[in-house]
Amino acid sequence: MSAAFVDADTARVKANAVKFIQLLDSIHMDELKKDTANIYAVAMGTFESIKSNAQSILTMTDIQEMRKDFSMVSENLYPFFKIINYEGEKMYWQNCPMAFGDEKEANWVSKTKEVMNPYLGKNHPEHKATMLHCGTVKDTIKAQ
C-alpha cells in the first residue's frame, strides 16, 4: 500500500488494501497454536488489529485519514512479523519524524531500503515532493 500512499492515489490505496486483506485471510493463523498459547494469543490480537485498520481504509475518502489507519496497520505489522518469526523476503522498518505534523512521527514497512515516504509523498499540500525521501531505516526485517 505504501507506494499508493506516496502517490496519494486513494483508488489505488483501496485496491491495495483489498489485496492486503485477501493476503491476511490466506494466513493460516492456526499453525501458531503449535507454539505456546501466549504466542498464538498475542499474534491473533495483533493480526485482528492489522485487519481492522486495513478494512477501515476501505471506508475512507480522505488520504490523510487513510494514512492514519495505514500508520496503525504498520505499527501492528512490525511486531506481528517479530512474533511469528517472519520468513519472507527482506523488508525495512522505516520512520518519518514528521508524518502528521512536526511533532507526530509514524512508521511503515517497505520492500525497499530507499525511503519513499508514504505520509508526505509526492503530492503533499504543503511540502509537495520535497519530503519524499524524508525518513530513516530503523530496522531490517528478514528471515530468522
Question: What does each model-identified segment do?
Answer:
Residues 1-144:
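Mature extracytoplasmic or organellar-lumen-exposed domains after removal of signal/transit peptides
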